[in-house]
Each structure stands twice: as structure tokens, then as C-alpha cells.
Amino acid sequence: MLNPLAQELNETLKGSVVEALMSDMGKRMYFPNGIISQGGEAAKDAYFANGTIGMAVAEKTPIELDSYKKIMPDLNPRETVAYEKTAGNPELRKIWKDKLLEKNPSLKDKQISLPILVPGLTAALSYVADLFVDENKPLLAADPCWDNYELIACARRGAEFHQFKCFDEKGLNLADLEKTMKEEAEKYGSVRVILNFPQNPSGYSPTKDEVQKITKIVKDIAESGKQVLVLSDDAYFGLNYEDDIEPQSLFAYMADLHENVLAIKADGPTKEDFAWGFRTGFLTFASKGLNQAQIDALQVKFMSAIRSSVSCSSTPSQAIIKHAFMNPDHDTQKAELRKMLHRRYDLVRKFVNTHTSSVLTPLPFNSGYFMAFDVKKIDAEDLRKRVLAEKGIGVIQINPKTLRVAFSSIDEEKIEEVFASIYNIAEAMISE
């Protein structure tokens, strides 16, 4: 039996692409008229005393221990120990939306939601899966891809996890993307696809021409009457090292593509602003067919996923990021770090362009934190272990044929030796 509040949200979403794509769990989700909502009312109208929220308060200010204050002297108690709102700090959400529009000018006249703040990008992907993925609604992603996609889809949601071949001998394999998406649409009546650029593990971002082709693939499926959820995992957005890369997110092109397309953008300062451990991410969504009431209803669905899991995200992290964004030196400092990553990329590019291997073939890469090798003749896990044991170099085995190297975490003066060691050990292994 559905809660009446869930029924009300579902009624608002009736006839929309959201309703067609929602999982069973998504249909059950609602935001209770409980502590949070009643506390919100009291925050506005309880002028004498507020006995709603479980915090220790003195003179209308959360009590903060001196041991905390000494560590964060520039933040006030509401920015350190108080609970933050379920969907995140309103000011920070507005700032992130402004930044999103600045980085994606094609969104200027398109209706998109106010970004919802979540505890990191993994949480963002997990909440999307909660609302839209289940045992009858599989998730589609690239092969190779980040292993957390399969963990979220299969282990958490009990769903099937399907993949398309990300690359062929020519580069980005758009033919297999189209083929697989159309097969999914025909079999299940709808498609849920994660498109992650810059891609993890390969470090590849599509060109302007490739983005137009991806957009056409999605639009063709939508025009056939099938619903498509396009989840843009933009964790490494903007870290581009070649001139022909499309500078905007796929989300900018999907946001009002068709009434049958629901576009969701998962992003945040984690990688873009070098704030990995702050665990602050954002979810933004859009669809040509959604009215404001339906946008509000889907936002409430996401808030219910947050409320029923972590309740709210870390207050200090949000406060620190908000103040950093307001610091005029922030973008300058970020640009310097991006230049450092670019230099590391250039060194890796120079090495792989001037060295050959009968075992290792670099997958296409032009952006992000990583590059990866297609491994032939040997197992990538065996190579990983040998490189670690013999040279003290850590890399990641994604699958038996894919080895990932995060050049983002390797000092410039060590890059040539690291890659030479990987190549040399790989060649030695096939001659043993």
C-alpha cells in the first residue's frame, strides 16, 4: 500500500517521462510531513521557542564546543555543527546552478532544476538508481567503466547491468552505443544509460562531432516512442587537454531534446575543484516535457531518497565550499592545478606516442585524471601485481584486459619511469 504522500507525487508525475521511467522504489518514495517539514515551519514562525530539532541550542544558536571552534575559527556554529537542509545549503545550490549555466551556455534558455546537494557523486548515482533502476529496468554503461556502476545496479538495486563496447579500432564506438541502446529500448520499452565523460577509466571525452551523433542516437530512440534516461556522470567535467573536445556537458544537449528524454547531471566540486574528501555532489535534472509541478515532485522524490539514507549532507563541507567559491582567488588557484594536470597529461601523451608495445595499447584519452591500457596476451591483474611488487608502483586493474593509471597522482618527474616500468614488465611477462 503506497503512502498517500507518495500517491500524491505519483499523480503529479502522471503522464510524464519520469512516471514511465520510475522504478518500484521510485514510486514508493515520499517526503514525510515529519520532523524536517515541521521543523521548517517552526524555523519561520516559532518566535518564542523552537523545540522541534534535536540539537543543543543556546540563545537561538547551536552550541559549538571550543575544540571544534579552534579548528574552524572562521565558520560560525550554523556552518559547523548545525544540521543542513535535506537538499543542501540553498546559497550553495544557487551558486552551483550559476556555475553550471556559465560552463554550459547552451542551457541559458532551458528549464532545469535547482541542483540538489548530495553526499558525493557516488550518492548521486545511487539515488538515481533508487528512483529509476530495478530488477525490470536495467542500467546501461560503457565497457570498460567504473566498477561502482555495477555494484550500485546489481548489489543495491537487484538490477541487470548491461554494457556497450566503449571503443573500437577507430575510437569511440558510437555504433555499438546505438545498437545496444536500441536493443534495450525494444526489449524493455525504455533505456537508462550512464554516459561518463571524461570517461573513467580511459580518460576520453567526445569531440563536438561525436556529441552531435550521440544526441541524434538518443533523439531517434525518443522519437520512436521509447523513454530514455540519460545520466551524465560529469565527475571530471572541464578537465580537457585537447582543442577538439566538446566543452559542454552532454546534459546541455539532452535537457530539452525531447519529451521522452529525462536528462540528469551528476557533478560536483569533488574533482572539478579538488575537494575529494568533502563528499559534496549535485544532481540536476531536466526534460522538455516537465512542468514546474512535476519538477518539484521529482525533487521531492530525490529528497526522500536522501532523507531515508543519510538525512542530510555534511554542513562544514558545504560551508567551506561556499566560502571558497566566493573567494576571488579560488578560480586562479584551480587554474594552476589544472595546468599541472595538463603537464602530466602531456608527458604521458609524449611517452605513449613514442613507445610501442606488443602487450599494451593505450585506449583513447584526452582529458580527466586517468589513462588506460588494453592488455593483450597477459592478465591485467598479473601485470598490476608485478608492477607493484617489482617497482613499487600502484595502478588499477579494471578488468582482465584493462589497466588504469591515474597520472593525476604521479609527480611529473616520475611519469616517464612509471610508464617505462609498466611497458618493460609487460614485455618481460610474455617472454617468460
Residue ranges and their predicted role:
Residues 2-7, 15, 19, 23-120, ...:
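N-terminal small-domain helix-loop-helix segment of the aminotransferase-like
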Residues 54-58, 122, 146-147, 198-201, ...:
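Short, solvent-exposed loop/turn segments at secondary-structure junctions
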Residues 334-349, 360-374, 400-402:
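Conserved glycine-rich beta-strand-loop-beta hairpin in the small C-terminal domain of fold type I
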Residues 48-50, 85, 360-366, 395-398:
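Short beta-strand
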Residues 4-9, 13-15, 255-339:
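Conserved core segment of the aminotransferase class I/II
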Residues 28-37, 65-69, 177-178, 208-220, ...:
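Well-ordered, non-membrane alpha-helical segments in soluble/globular domains
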Residues 79-230, 237-258, 413:
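Conserved core of the PLP fold type I
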Residues 98, 102, 182, 259, ...:
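PLP-dependent enzyme catalytic core of the Aspartate aminotransferase-like
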